[in-house]
Each structure stands twice: as structure tokens, then as C-alpha cells.
Amino acid sequence: MISYNLSMEFKTIIEPFKIKSVESLPITTPEQRKEYLERENWNVFGLRSQEVTVDLLTDSGTGSMSSEQWAAIMRGDEAYAGSHSWQRFHEVVSDLTGYKHIIPTHQGRASEKILATITVKEGDIIPSNSHFDTTRANFEFAQAKPVDLLCEEGLDLLSPAPFKGNINLSKLEALLSGEESDKVPFVLMTITNNTGGGQPVSMNNLKKVKELCTQYNKMFLLDACRFAENAWFVSQREEDYKDMEIRDITKKAFRLADGCTISLKKDGFGNIGGVLALNDDTLAEAARNLLILTEGFPTYGGLAGRDLDALAQGLKEITDRNYLEYRARSISYLGEKALSYGIPVVQPAGGHALYIDAKTFLPNIPPHEYPGHSVACEIYLLGGVRVVELGTLAFGVAGENGKPDTPATHELVRLAAPRRTYTQSHFDYVAEVLEKLAENKDKLKGYEVIEQPKLLRHFTAKLKPLI
């Protein structure tokens, strides 16, 4: 497995925290797990938490809060307007991002929805290194066209390139200088690039995007859900930033852009929460008006005061170098194990998740039969570990009139690690499940969709295995 300066004094990966409270894990039998999946029409999103032993479905809102965050909850001020909790939250986010207007929301997709509503019109084009599923869906709902312009290195899952989350600058400039430039309201950069395998974006790439946006008079925004993980990779892989504090790198990244959306359920160490931050006064006023209509008053945005305080504290903790190094090493360790079993994974390992290349792993299953979903179901059946497909089921275009789906670029399976939740023993257990997956690969079959919604179908689609 390719890694970058992940060495520590000792080989053992230890959690840089100790456990103060515990929750029992459910242990299920293979027979029970098959029954549960059949009941939910073979969609892992339908599984109940008490039916999952290790839950790697997402790192969003599933992490553990620190004792300082729990203490901050007790300081929560639940005043409807102008609470102390809001003031503390505003101070931390303003210092971190440098943006003029800080608008809290209940989670990231609420920020995306507001942004899409106030900035996008029918026929607009939204370029990005890669849009994630909810981001893409919100822009499509606004009748815009999200366009992914991932760099060439990012398209090669095995490339050792250090910044495979970068945007293709030549393609971006071609769009901004071309006939459809007037259809582009802004450029959105996702850090880290979740869809592209949790890969980081370099500061140099962000600077070049800023230069292009300035040249062509376009707003530059960040989807910054994993801003701290991106900054850690920058500190490891970009020479000019190797001696810089993680928080300082983060501040520089934010200050290149004109605003951002953040799901604080990731690098805010929160179980709920988000933010939309902007410099433009007119857009901020429109955002606040919509916020009042849909989320709540601008000083709480659908969140309790205690949540705002917990998030403010989490945003102080997330840039700890020891924590970020432990997290990256844990994912890299799991990737090394998978490779040793002959399971192809995206390399280098991402910051928040391991991504299995299901297309290469199961070449006998075509994209329209969802090889990634087959892998996800098998991992659950083998060991009660829940993961998610990020391939044609999630990102493809559903076929019409009996025609097969238009496939996604890649067929990936994401194993996303909740923050500060599982120990090294849990990762060893997951590795054993992956070993059994490799042993069973020739037995895996494809799936077909029997019912699906028009948008974000992977969340609620009903499927069945092919015979």
C-alpha cells in the first residue's frame, strides 16, 4: 500500500485518546444477516443499527464526541436569537475560515440546498473536481448540470500520485473561456475528494483554481467537509507546507475561496450540524432569508444551542496532528491488508475511508448489475460490517424502457471510518472479513433494481440478487 510519511516511532497504531463510555456491539449470525437483508430488499441503508456489528456506512455524524464536547453541551444556551452558543460558534468558524457571513444549518445538504437555490438557475453548469451525491442532487434539482473535471491521475485508481483529488485545470479553463462560460455561476472544489476515493487536493491546485476564477470573474467555493484531513495530507505531501501547522494550512485554504459549505458531521466532530459561509453580502442576505423560511433563525439554523457549542469545540480539536496521523494510518493499514488478500483498492489510501475497486475485483459482473453493491452485501453477510456502494447504483444514470444503466466512471465500495469510534481490534476484524470476501469472490452474483426513486436512488432502492 502506498503511503506518505506515515511512520511513527512504533509500528503499533494506537488511538490517541482513551475511552470514557462504551456501547455494546450487536453480534449476529449469518442466518440472521441474510434475513435482515432480505427484509430490506437487499439495501444496506435499510438495516437497523442493532443489526450491524461494525458500521462503516459513513463517517458523517457517526463519530464519538470528546469529554470537552460533552462539557460544552452543558454550556448550551437555548435562546431563540443571539444565544451565547451562537456567539462561540461564530467566533470559532470565523477565525477558522475568515469568511464575512457565517450561516449555521442542520447539516451539509441543507447548506447545499440553500446555495443551489440562491445561486443557480436552469441550464447552469457547475464545474468541480468531483461532486458528491447530495451536492450533485441539489444542483440537478435546481435544473443545473454538475460537471466533474477530475485530474487525469485521479481517473487511474492505482496511480501513486499524491493529489489525485485535484481538478483538471486545462479542462476547467476551457470551460471558463468557452462559449458556455456565462452559464457557470461558480466553481466548487470538494476537499477531500470523497467521490474520487477520499483523495486530497493540493494547495497549488486550489491556488490555480483561484487564479482562473479571478481571471474569468467567477466565484470560487469549497465543499469543505473534510478540510482538516485535506490539510494533513498537504502537510505530508506538499513541500512548501511540511513545517506548517495543520490549522494554518486550513486557514490558507479557506481564504483562497469566496465561501464554503461544510457538513460539520465530518471534520466538525459533530453528530449533526453544518454551515454555509460567504463573503458576498447580497448572497448572504438571500441565504439568511431562505434559512429563516426553511431552517430557523440565522443564529441557530435548525440547531440547538448545545449542538453549536459542541461543534465549536469540535472545530478546535479536529486539527490535532496526532489524531489526523492516527486516522490516516488506520485507513492505510486496512488498505495494506486488503491488498495482501488480492482485493484491489484505490491507492494511496484516502483520509476517511478505504475504497475497494469492485470493477476490477468482480470483472464478471457488468456495471448495470452493480458489482459494488454485490461486494457491499457480501461484506455484511460475512461479518455484519456495513459499507456502501459508490458506483453505478449511486452515480450512474438509470436506464429507461428496459435499457441498461449508464455506468458511473468507477465501481467503488467505500469503507468509511467513524471518527474516534472504533479501535485497532475493530480494524483487524474488518480485515478478516475482507479476507473471507476474497475467498468467496467467485460466488458473488449481480443484482437488479426492482423499484427506485428518481433522485439519490441508492438510499431507498429495492433490489434482488440475480440467480
Give the location of each predicted region:
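Short beta-strand-to-loop capping motifs
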Residues: 278, 356-359, 417-419
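PLP-dependent enzyme catalytic core of the Aspartate aminotransferase-like
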Residues: 318, 394-467
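Conserved PLP-enzyme active-site core in the AAT-like
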Residues: 6-42, 46-48, 52-63, 69, ...
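Short, solvent-exposed beta-strand edge segments and adjacent coil->beta transition regions
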Residues: 271-273, 351, 410-414
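Conserved small-domain helix->loop->beta segment predominantly found in fold-type I
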Residues: 299-377, 382-409, 444-455
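C-terminal, active-site-flanking charged/polar segments
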Residues: 25, 29, 374-381, 435-437
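A short, surface-exposed helix-loop junction/capping segment
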Residues: 67-75, 358
